[in-house]
Structures are given as structure tokens and as C-alpha cells.
Swiss-Prot record:
Residues 795-845 are annotated as: Disordered. Belongs to the SecA family. It holds the Pfam family SecA_DEAD. The gene is secA1. This is Protein translocase subunit SecA 1. It comes from Staphylococcus haemolyticus (strain JCSC1435). It is found in: Cell membrane; Cytoplasm.
């Protein structure tokens, strides 16, 4: 009880503090009333000028704290003139809590939308953008349209971000002082912004301040399902199949060389020639053919370096990796970089991962990137621990403007569901006779339809509220408080819209809320109850339960059933027991605790990918924002060469074999014959590095000389393409690792620690692959001097999807490609033979 009393005392203390500041705001009412409309706009301009002169975000916040009373008083006056509504003191208190970066818990009907206008206005003065976030696009559209009138009167601009808007329209919406959007669309825009190739293609500004309406729904209920942008799969899958067919046709030594020591396999001139004919391409080494080369190399590796029943097994149509140390299969683990798919193609089983995740993020990680985050809802106190631990937000319960008159009756418990529903229908019929409006809350859509059929049989006209239809939803909710109205709704439907009582309804008891089942979360039950008794209206609520309800079955209703049977109670007789209600609440707390633990676990795993995502996105943004990436390219070339020297050259070896190192250098940096054994024979690793480095520099300068001013554009294109290719592969690999990692707990291992360690190793490997690919394409791409390198348009963003919502889905756009440069007849042949193209692979032309 000590902990609970501390929370209660803390809320009391906070409410007192908010009340004091709110009184200060209210005391300025007369000062604002004498200002003309023009003077109000000028006051905004003055605030903007003063706050925007401060560059430091923390100091800006301090300044906003200082002007809060004046700013809030100004908004109150604006609301009075525009809407003929003046925010109450409790609304001002809620607005102060939101500005602080906390959650204002305000009961239904207390005017959360108007409450949000004050902190939105105040924080928008900083000129960094404020995002007002709703659960669906309908609410975003309605609120932005209604509130724009007030903000524009005060001198601020408002934007609306919808899924249907074009890139330019989105950019314009985000450029406004205040932007209304759904959580889904914000997350997708963030991911898409980190997939562009040019700075001017971004739509968002840096994330500054967000106010989330129905914050518990977005940050708690939707926290576990990630936002995903995925690419099309057909092309990728068919390429694995084609590469597999091609690999089967090749002959060892003639078409490819295999080094058993390093397990490296690469095409010979003859092999490259065959590939060009098979895939109907002119030059295998053109930049645009990177995907083809990658698939061929992977297919070769699958056929030549990996053996069935040694490196992997095929069990029930699935390729399972064999642990080289234990000899056991590793379910859930997959080879990375497309190798697993290549093996699946080789073995003729279904090629997995038809859609490739190009980018993903959870709401937990997206919203934690804002400088300041706040929210409002009718129900958040039960989840306060989660808000505090994960988002560093406190929940402040704001007092109601008028005392709550709703009568929350105790639960009625029946033996069977039939008995329960019969009783619900009788209750509705009785209330309907008196004209009292009834709102029936159900947990599932099927239950809504079942009750709807029962009411139809009794001749009761009613509406069924479907959360999928937002426009119809508002209309139904608007009528739900009228005399004689009966509305059936799933518990989550209708959020964000108030039920206002019709004429004469107050006198007959107000809105009656009937819950047909307890939800596993107390919060959802509280939301349903909160539909009644808004702004001091009369009303009542009651839950009807049965021992067959899912929650009761899960948490032991057998004992209760035996007791009811002993008492000889039949299906039509309920028990009304505080003990049972307490047991139900205890079961709900257990479920909430389990769900919190699951979300916390997901966050711990996601933290690994979050850090990696941050590094990759920063790297991409640096490349995009930089005019010249030559320093980065230089560092990658040196790093790749240094790794090659370290791996292949051992100074302790008295009789070193330089062939693997020379093959490596030829494969990544130089043409065949450029590095001779006598140039490095007998030298130590440092000298060998310098010998090769001087040759690399010459090749680099030669490439630069060919395209001159366009080198920066060429390097940017190669860097971004290499990063994106390997990053999307890495996301897939990490996902596969995560799916199978829980099995480690059976072997007394710590799955999270293993995931962190292996994830770190995979990331390092990916970074090395990016560097090696970049080195190879910068030095080995055949550049035609007289043809411009085109700016590469942004890659296809694929399909945006969020498991629990339809808002964010976007149709895949056609993918633009960069034209490859043809090989000049006198240029060195790209196959690495050292011959001129016309005397080698150019003979056929």
C-alpha cells in the first residue's frame, strides 16, 4: 500500500502545482480580452521571434515555460472569439501537463481536443514543428480542419499529412508550424526519408515535439507490431531460380575457380561470357547488374562450397543449418546475404521470404526519437509503470470540470454465456421501453453480430458500430445519446468522438453502458464505462459476465462454478459478488503484467537493431548531405585492403603462398596481372600494403579522370546502393536470428545475450561487405567517358504495412534504374583477363 499511496500523493501534489499555474493563466483573461485580432497575431509574431532567436533546445524550452501563462491566455481568448468556447481551468491544467512532456488523463467529454490547442500553440512558436497524432485519418482530417481556424486566427500555419498525399504535398504539410497525422503515416514517412538518395527528396524535418491523442492505444496497444516497408518478392525469387539453373550448367575450372582454403569461388572469363548470354546482358560488370552478379555468386557458393547433410539438412521441405561444432540442426537460423534462398533453390524446396523487409521500426523506438513527447487519453493510470519505464512519461490525472454522476454498478455473473446474453437483452428491452439510450460494448465483432441478431428477434432497432468505417462511426456515435437509441460497439470503436445526450435523456437516467464481457485490460473496460457520464451528465454502467468467458476460463472459474452448482443456482440467476469482481480484476492485472513483460522483452531485442539502424541511417544521411564522399571511399578502400593483408599474409610463414592474396586483390581492386608475386615476395605486411595501395590509388585516379566532375555523383550512387543492398539483407538475417533465438533457452543459454553478441558480429560483417562491395564497384566499374552518369532516383519504397492497421499501406511504385555504361572497345575487359575488351568478351559484338 505504501507504493500506491505514494502515487496518489504524487498526483495530488502535481495537481496542486498545475492548479497554481492555471490560476495564473486565468488571471490574464482580462488583459487578453482588450487586444484586437491584429494585436493577437502580432503577439504571436513577437513570441516566435524571441523564441526562435534561441538555438539551444533546452534553453528554448525554458523560455517557453516562462511565457506559458501569456501564451495559454492568448489561446483561451482566441478559442472564445473563434469557437465561442473558453477552455476551463481543468483543460488549462491538462495543457500544462502536456507541455511538460507528460500524459494528461482526462475523462471522456472533458474536451481533450481543445486542451491540446494550448501546448500545441506554445511549442509551435519554436518553429521546429509540432505533430498532433490521432489513431486514424478521419480524426486527423476533422481535427485539423476544425482547429486550423483557431491556429490561423492566432497566426500559425497548419498541415494535414495523409497516406494519399504526394511527396511534395507531404513535404508542405510537414513544413507547417503544426502537422496533423496518424502514427502509422509518421512512422512510414520516417522510414521512407531514410531510403531516399537526395536531400531534397526528404519530406520530414527533425522530430521535435509530438502530442498523441489516445496515447495508450498507440504507445501500449500497438507497441508490439512494427511498421514495415517491404520490397516485392517475385523478381527476387525468380532470380534465385534462374541463378540456380545457371550454376548447374557450369563446369569446374572451365567456368569457375574454387579455392578450397578460403572457400572462395569466382567465375572465369568463360563463365562470365556464359552468364551474359544466359541473362541476356551486354556486360556482367555494369553497375546495374550488381543484383545478377550477387545471385550468381550466391548460387555458385550454394552448389560448390556447401554440402547437403554436412553444412545443412533438408527436413520436411525446410533447409536447416547444421551447427559445425555440435552437428545439430539450428531451427530458425538462416544463412545471410541470400545464401539460404540459393540453397532452397538448389534443393527445389519453397524459397522463403517472398517479401524482403527494406526498413522497419516499432512505435516504441520511433516515438522515443522526439525531443519531447506527450499525450492525452481517458485511461492511462493503469499503465503508468510502462509509460514511465519505456517513454519516461508521467501520468497526471486531471480533475473533471463537474463531479462525475455516473453510477458504476457491480458485475453480474452467470453460469453460461446463453444465460448472460438473455439477461443483457432483457436489460436492453427494459431500458428501451423507458427511452433510455443504451451502449452495448463487446470484445469481438462476432459477439456484436450475435447480440444484434438477438435484438432483431425482439424487434429492437439498433446500430452496430464498426471501427473500420470511420465516417459512419462518427454519425452513429453522434446519435448514440438520443432517446431510445441502442448501439452495439466493439470496445475499441468510437474512440475520439463523444456521445452527447439528446433532449430529455438526462431526466431518464442518461446513457446506460452495458459491457458484455471483461476485456483482459482494465483500461479498455474503463474506456467503455467512460462513454457515459461525460461533463457531469447522469448515466450508469454494468458488466455482465459468464463463467464461460475467456478471461474467466483462463483464470480458474471452476471453483466458482462448483459453488454456484452447490447453491442450486440456475442459468437465469446471477451472482453479484465483490469477491468475484476482485478476482476478475486480479486476473486482468496478471494479463497486463504479462503483456508489459512481453513489450519490454521486445524492446530489449529491438534495441540491438535500433542502434544499428541509427548507425546506418546516419551514414546514409552523411553521404546524402555531403557534396564529396571521396574521403569515405578512401577510408573504405584502405580498410578493405588492410583486412585482406591481415587475413592472407602471415609474417611467421617461412614459405608463404601469395596466390590467394593476389587472387583477392584482383577480385576486389585490380585487374589480373596488375600485381605480380615478385613485387611483394619477401616483404612484410606493411610494405605489401603500401605496394598494393599505390596501385589502387592509380586505378582510382584513372576512374576519376574518366568522369571528372561526375565522380562525386558516381561514388554517392555506389555507396548508397551498396549500403541499401546489404542493410535489407541484414534486417532479414536479424529477423531470422530473432525468430530462432528463443530455442537457446532450452540449452541453458541466455537468448538475449546471444542475440546481442551475434547481432553485433553480423553487423560488423555487413559493414565489411559494404566496404568490399564499394571498393569493387568504384575501381572495377567500366565507365564510358562520353556518357553522363544520371542522378539515381530513389529506390522503390515497396509496400508499407502495419499489422494492426490499414492506414499506412502504400502501393508499390515502379523501381527506377540507373543506366549502366557500356564498355569501350579499347577498355580493359571487365572479366579481369587484362586483355582489351574487343579482343576478349567484345569479340561477339
Amino acid at each position: 500500500m505504501g507504493f500506491l499511496s505514494k502515487i496518489v500523493d504524487g498526483n495530488k501534489k502535481e495537481t496542486k502545482r498545475l492548479s497554481k499555474i492555471a490560476d495564473e493563466v486565468l488571471s490574464l483573461e482580462e488583459d487578453m480580452a482588450i487586444l484586437t485580432d491584429e494585436e493577437i497575431k502580432n503577439k504571436t509574431k513577437q513570441f516566435q521571434q524571441e523564441v526562435q532567436e534561441i538555438e539551444d533546445v533546452k534553453k528554448q524550452n525554458d523560455y517557453l515555460d516562462k511565457i506559458l501563462p501569456q501564451a495559454y491566455a492568448l489561446v483561451r481568448e482566441g478559442a472564445k472569439r473563434v469557437f465561442n468556447m473558453t477552455p476551463y481551468k481543468v483543460q488549462v491544467m491538462g495543457g500544462i501537463a502536456i507541455h511538460k512532456g507528460d500524459i494528461a488523463e482526462m475523462r471522456t467529454g472533458e474536451g481533450k481536443t481543445l486542451t491540446a490547442t494550448m501546448p500545441t500553440y506554445l511549442n509551435a512558436l519554436a518553429g521546429r514543428g509540432v505533430h498532433v497524432i490521432t489513431v486514424n485519418e478521419y480524426l486527423s482530417s476533422v481535427q485539423s480542419e476544425e482547429m486550423a481556424e483557431l491556429y490561423e486566427f492566432l497566426g500559425l500555419t497548419v498541415g494535414l499529412n495523409l497516406n494519399s498525399k504526394s511527396t511534395n504535398e507531404k513535404r508542405e504539410a510537414y513544413a507547417q508550424d503544426i502537422t496533423y497525422s496518424t502514427n502509422n503515416e509518421l512512422g512510414f514517412d520516417y522510414l521512407r526519408d531514410n531510403m531516399v538518395n537526395y536531400a531534397e527528396e526528404r519530406v520530414m524535418r527533425p522530430l521535435h515535439f509530438a502530442i498523441i491523442d489516445e496515447v495508450d492505444s498507440i504507445l501500449i496497444d500497438e507497441a508490439r507490431t512494427p511498421l514495415i516497408i517491404s520490397g516485392e518478392a517475385e523478381k527476387s525469387t525468380s532470380l534465385y531460380t534462374q541463378a540456380n539453373v545457371f550454376a548447374k550448367m557450369l563446369k569446374a575450372e572451365d567456368d569457375y575457380k574454387y579455392d578450397e582454403k578460403t572457400k572462395a569461388v569466382h567465375l572465369t572469363e568463360q563463365g562470365a561470357d556464359k552468364a551474359e548470354r544466359m541473362f541476356k546482358i551486354e556486360n556482367l560488370y555494369d553497375v546495374q547488374n550488381v543484383e545478377v552478379i550477387s545471385h550468381i555468386n550466391t548460387a555458385l557458393k550454394a552448389h560448390v562450397t556447401l554440402q547437403r547433410d554436412v553444412d545443412y539438412m533438408v527436413v520436411d521441405g525446410e533447409v536447416l543449418i547444421v551447427d559445425q561444432f555440435t552437428g545439430r540442426t539450428m531451427p530458425g537460423r538462416r544463412f545471410s546475404e541470400g545464401l539460404h534462398q540459393a540453397i532452397e533453390a538448389k534443393e527445389g524446396v519453397k524459397i522463403q521470404n517472398e517479401s524482403k523487409t527494406m526498413a522497419s521500426i516499432t512505435f516504441q523506438n520511433y516515438f522515443r526519437m522526439y525531443n519531447k513527447l506527450a499525450g492525452m487519453t481517458g485511461t492511462a493510470k493503469t499503465e503508468e509503470e510502462e509509460f514511465r519505464n519505456i517513454y519516461n512519461m508521467t501520468v497526471t490525472q486531471i480533475p473533471t470540470n463537474k463531479p462525475v454522476q455516473r453510477d458504476d454498478k457491480s458485475d453480474l455473473i452467470y453460469i453460461s454465456q446463453k444465460g448472460k446474453f438473455d439477461a443483457v437483452v432483457e436489460d436492453v428491452v427494459e431500458k428501451h421501453k423507458q427511452g433510455q439510450p443504451v451502449l452495448l460494448g463487446t470484445v469481438a465483432v462476432e459477439t456484436s453480430e450475435y447480440i444484434s441478431n438477438l435484438l432483431k428477434k425482439r424487434g429492437i432497432r439498433h446500430d452496430v458500430l464498426n471501427a473500420k468505417n470511420h465516417e459512419r462511426e462518427a454519425e452513429i456515435v453522434a446519435n448514440a445519446g438520443q432517446k431510445g437509441a441502442v448501439t452495439i460497439a466493439t470496445n475499441m470503436a468510437g474512440r475520439g468522438t463523444d456521445i452527447k445526450l439528446g433532449e430529455g435523456v438526462e431526466e431518464i437516467g442518461g446513457l446506460a453502458v452495458i459491457g458484455t464481457e471483461r476485456h483482459e485490460s482494465r483500461r479498455i473496460d474503463d474506456q467503455l464505462r467512460g462513454r457515459s457520464g461525460r461533463q457531469g451528465d447522469r448515466g450508469d454502467s454494468r458488466f455482465y459476465l459468464s463463467l464461460q468467458d475467456e478471461l474467466m476460463v483462463r483464470f480458474g472459474s471452476e471453483r466458482l462454478q462448483k459453488m454456484m452448482n452447490r447453491l442450486g443456482m440456475d442459468d437465469s440467476t446471477p451472482i453479484e459478488s465483490k469477491m468475484v469482481s476482485r478476482a476478475v480484476e486480479s486476473a486482468q492485472k496478471r494479463v497486463e503484467g504479462n503483456n508489459f513483460d512481453a513489450r519490454k522483452r521486445i524492446l530489449e531485442y529491438d534495441e540491438v537493431l535500433r542502434k544499428q539502424r541509427e548507425i546506418i541511417y546516419n551514414e546514409r544521411n552523411n553521404i546524402i548531405d555531403s557534396e564529396d564522399s571521396s574521403q569515405l571511399v578512401n577510408a573504405m578502400l584502405r580498410s578493405t585492403l588492410q583486412r585482406g593483408v591481415t587475413y592472407h599474409i602471415s609474417e611467421e610463414d617461412d614459405n608463404p603462398d601469395y596466390a590467394p592474396f593476389i587472387n583477392y586483390v584482383n577480385d576486389v581492386f585490380l585487374q589480373e596481372g596488375d600485381l605480380k608475386e615478385e613485387e611483394i615476395n619477401g616483404k612484410d605486411s606493411e610494405d605489401i600494403f603500401e605496394v598494393v595501395w599505390s596501385k589502387i590509388e592509380k586505378v582510382y585516379e584513372s576512374q576519376k579522370a574518366k568522369i571528372g566532375d561526375q565522380m562525386a555523383e558516381f561514388e554517392r550512387m555506389i555507396l548508397l546502393r551498396s549500403i541499401d543492398t546489404h542493410w535489407t539483407d541484414h534486417i532479414d538475417t536479424m529477423d531470422q536470428l530473432r525468430q530462432g533465438i528463443h530455442l537457446r533457452s532450452y540449452a541453458q543459454q541466455n537468448p538475449l545475450r546471444d542475440y546481442q553478441n551475434e547481432g553485433h558480429e553480423l553487423f560488423d560483417m555487413m559493414m565489411q561487405n559494404i566496404e568490399e562491395d564499394t571498393s569493387k564497384f568504384i575501381l572495377k566499374s567500366v565507365i564510358q567517358v562520353d556518357e553522363n552518369i544520371e542522378r539515381e532516383k530513389t529506390t522503390d519504397f515497396g509496400t508499407a504495412q502495419h499489422v494492426s492497421a490499414e492506414d499506412g499501406k502504400e502501393k508499390a511504385k515502379k523501381q527506377p534504374i540507373v543506366k549502366g555504361d557500356k564498355v569501350g572497345r579499347n577498355d580493359p575487359c571487365p572479366c579481369g583477363s587484362g586483355k582489351k575488351y574487343k579482343n576478349c568478351h567484345g569479340k561477339e559484338e
